[in-house]
């Protein structure tokens, strides 16, 4: 018992030192109720029960202290010490760490053991798990459960993958069905009628999808209607495949179908880079419809001038539309009628050149946010004409240069607007300051002027001056009279 009492006394003394060392203006300020508790427990632990009389009404603080102390009744000193330390434990975490607090923590020890014991007694499941972990066979069983759960998760993932593969296969079958082909043909006819093309039309043209009919003697619109359903089918299949990144890229730019959309208000460089090929393709389709007879003439010139076999020429004619669109997408590269590259490899077959273009555009398609690189080495933009008449189609302006110019123009206009706003602001400030000064001056001088000269006074001089001028002669006469009377009295 003596050892227990000494432990409680030591803890109590350490807690009292902590309370006494608290600064008056420190970060931790205990409440009045808390200080009353500490006071009552301290008095009970040091002096015992309260035996002094209650203070008078003139000492309200003493009365509160006496009430708190006397409320403890016959509590023993040891119990008061324990209660004092327990109250200290409640606020110990919120107190700043000082030397006294460290000393108290060393004396008290790990006072969270009660929570740990209660947790261990209340949770039988935790003890069971600890027993399982301590025994070797149970560890194997647990590992087996873990492995089975992992294998179950893997089987679920495999099932999801199989479902995705089945969906992809079903999408491919749907793409091959004639119903989908008819729907794609209708969508593509509508897009051709509106001169609007999706951005995914460009890489699909480069993936080797070729038409099987020559352009000799056929109308361009009929050829487009015949060739583009297969392109739209491949486009839909490609978008339903694993290339989700390109799907998001195309869906984000499908609304850019008008030339009136300004590049200044685009959200990103990627959107700007995708807007240029759309404008080029739109203008290219219009020129293709307007100059169908140029296609026939140039195709006959190609058959006469080339040294390739006839089936190679036919293949070149079939590739005419795809190569023309290739040239429209290119920033640099000269394309003439008939799908013939103006400055490509000398006498090389069109099939080899087509493969090279496919590789380049495939790389462009895989990269997001990059500009389309030229395939040909021509110094001018895309051209289309009859033998060299230089009929322009597409856009010759550099997208990056035009973007920089537009940004510069916008910045200049913004600076001008800001200067105008600043000038107007300075003018308003000056007018406000002048009005304030005039109002102050009027308020200062108005009372004086009202005293000197009222608004109803018809004369220029003030009423006071006029009254003084009238009264002054009488006053002067009276003073002279008084002076003369005194002088007479002195003489007498």
UniProtKB/Swiss-Prot annotation:
* Membrane topology annotation: Single-pass membrane protein
State a single Pfam family of this protein: ACBP
Q: Which UniProt keywords apply?
A: Autophagy, Coiled coil, Lipid-binding, Membrane, Peroxisome, Transmembrane, Transmembrane helix, Transport
Q: Where is the composition biased (Gly residues)?
A: 378-388
Domain of life where this protein originates: Eukaryota
List GO molecular-function terms, semicolon-separated.
fatty-acyl-CoA binding
Biased composition of type Basic and acidic residues is found at 335-360, 389-399
Q: Where is this region: Disordered?
A: 141-162, 335-399
What family is it from?
A: Belongs to the ATG37 family.
Function recorded in the entry:
Acyl-CoA binding protein which acts as the peroxisome receptor for pexophagy but is dispensable for aggrephagy and nonselective autophagy. Binds medium- and long-chain acyl-CoA esters.
Protein name per the record: Acyl-CoA-binding domain-containing protein 5
Taxonomic lineage is: Eukaryota, Metazoa, Chordata, Craniata, Vertebrata
